[in-house]
Amino acid sequence: MGDYFAWDFANISGSNTSGSLNLNQLNLDNINNGLHNQEDGAGGRNENSERVGSGSPGSVSMQVLSLFSAVNSALATLEKSEEFPSVVKDEQSIFPAVAKASNSLDELAQNIIPAPSPPGFNRKRKTFDEDSSVEMIRRAISDHLDLLNNCCIGIANLNEDSVHKISLTRSGKPSQLVTVSCRHSSVIQKSYGSEKRYLCPPPMVYINGNYSSIFNQSFRTEISIMNDFGQCSQPISEEYTGQGCMIFRSLHISSLVAAKSKNLRLSLDMFSNVNNQLLSHLVTSSISIVSKPSKKGSKLKISNITLRSGSVVSLYNRINSQTVRTKYTSIEAGQFCLRGDRWVPLRINLLLPDENGKLKVCDDVDNPEPIKYGSIVELVDEATGTTSDPLIIRRVEKDHIAEEDGYVNQMHRIVLESAYPISNVRHLKIAEHSSLAYSNNISVRWFLGATSAQNRNASSEAILPIEWEAVGNLSSNEMTRVGDSVCWTIVGISHFDCTMMLPFNQNPVPTVTDYPYIEEPPEYLESSRSLQFKIGGYSVGLQIWLGVHGPLSYSFTAAADTSTMGTVTLGLSQISYDPSCAEQKYPLLFVIPGGIVIIGKCEILLTSSAFGN
C-alpha cells in the first residue's frame, strides 16, 4: 500500500437514481383500545377469569398486540432494506436493541412490552428518510475532498510533532481523517531452533489526526507477526496515550511462525481500553524472510533485497552482537544521533559526478540505479531535510573492510567513510579519542562512529551524537581493521499507511476483516467503460466510490485459494461528465460494512477525450 498512482482515463456520462418505499405506520394505540373495548363488552367474568391464560381472550389480545408490534418493526426494517439495502446490515449491528423476529405466537406472547425502536427507526424516521447514510458519506467526502486528494499525492512525513496536527475541511471544521502509519523493516532474518530474532529496527506505529472519532480516547495496539497460513506470534501490546508514536521493541520472530513461509506480515489490532472491544484490524505489506547474509558468491547479482538509489533504510550499531547494546540512527535538532528507543527512516541517494565533476543525486525514479560498494551516497531525513556529508559505502567482512565489489544488500554490515578530507565536512564533529590520530605518523581514514553513544553508562532513552572516528593503518598496504563502533547494519524500510474517516456520529461497527487496498495499478477497459484493478482485503458488502460518486457498481472475481484478494471491475457509467472541467480528478475510496471510509491512495483522472471533445 505504500505506492501512489495517478491515471488518465475518459470520463463516462450517466446517472444513478433510486426509488424509495413508503409504508403507512400502524396505529397500535387504536388497535389496543379496540381490543380492550371488546373485553369490557364481553361481561360475565369473575376475578379468576380475569387471569390471563393460554386460551383466554386476554392472552389472545396480548398475543395479537405483540404480533402487530413485531409486524410493525419488520415493516420498518423492510422499508429501510428497500430504500437503503447497502446499510441495513450495518444499522442492525449498530443498533443491537432491535427485536428479533419470532415465528411462534407463543414466543410473541412472552414479549408483553414491545421492544423499543432504535434511534434511526423512530416513528418519524427522520434520520434515514431525510439524511440517509449514503448522503452522509457523500457530504463528508465532499467536505474532505481537498484533504483526500492530498492523501493520494504521497506519504506524509511523520514525526512526533506532525502527528498532533489536525487539518481543517472546506467548511472550516476539524478533519475527521485518521491515518495509521506503520514503519517496519522490509526483511526479517530467519530464526533457528528456539532462538528469538528481534525485528531490527522495531516496528513503529504513528496515529495522526482525530483518532478519538474512530478509536475512542483510550485504546491500545497489539501487534504480532503473521505467516502465510494465518498463524500469528505472541502479540506485543502498547498503550496509546496521545504520544503520537508507539514502538514495539519486544517483537520477535520464532521458528514456528516462520516455518515454510516465504513472506510474513504484521497484524495490527486496536482495542478499546474501556470494554476491550476490537476497534480496527490492519495488516501490513509483506516482509521477506532472509537467512544470514552470504559473504561469498552472488556479489554481482541484483536481488529483491538489493538497495537502490532513493531506497528508504535504517542504520543501527550493535556492540558484541548484544541486543541491549543496539542503537538506531535518528535526528535531533537537525543533527544525526543515536537512540535506543527511537529511529528515523532515512533515504539513501546515490551521488554521481556531472559534466563539471560536481556530485549530483541520481534521481531516475523509473529505473533507480542499484548501489554498489565503493559508491558515494548521502543520507537524507525527508521530514526535517537534514542531509549527511557525502559518504563512501564499504562492506565489512571479518572486521576488515572488504574489496569494493558487489551490490549493497539489506542486512549487510557496512562502514560509511567520509568522501572528503575531514577538514571539509560540515555536519558532524570529531570524536575526542580520534584527535590522537593527527599526532601519529599513520594513514588515517574517517568513518561514522558510535563510540560515545555506546557508552555503557548511557540509558536507552539517551540521545547521543554520531561522530567522525579515525581508523589508521601502520602501512598503506595493510587491510583496514575496524571495530564494532564504526560498523553499521543497513536494512530497508517498508511503510504501511491507512487513512480513514467515519462520516456518522457514532462508533464504527467492529470488523476483523482486512482493510481494502489496491495491489496493482488500475487499467481502463474502453470496451466496457470500466476500471479493472487488483485488490486485497476485500469483504462482502464493500462499497467503492470515486470522490463523491458512489456507491458504484462493480464485480469482484476472487483469486485462487482466497476470498479477500482478487480483481475488481468498476463501472463508470454512474459518473456524469462536467463540460466545465477539462479533466476531473477523483480519489478512489472504499466504504467497509462498518461504515468507515478507507482512502485507496489512488487518484483517477477522467478527461473528455472519450466524448470527442
UniProtKB/Swiss-Prot annotation:
Name of a matching Pfam family: LAG1-DNAbind
GO biological process, alphabetically ordered: cell adhesion; positive regulation of transcription by RNA polymerase II; regulation of lipid metabolic process
Segments passing through the bilayer: none
Keyword Cell division: no
Region (Disordered): 32-58
Swiss-Prot/TrEMBL keywords: Cell adhesion, Cytoplasm, DNA-binding, Nucleus, Transcription, Transcription regulation
Domain of life assignment: Eukaryota
Free-text function comment from the UniProt entry: Transcription factor that behaves as a negative regulator of adhesion. Recognizes specifically the canonical CSL response element GTGA/GGAA. May also play a cbf12-antagonistic role in the regulation of a number of other important processes such as extracellular material production, colony morphogenesis, ploidy maintenance, or meiosis.
Name of the protein in its database record: Transcription factor cbf11
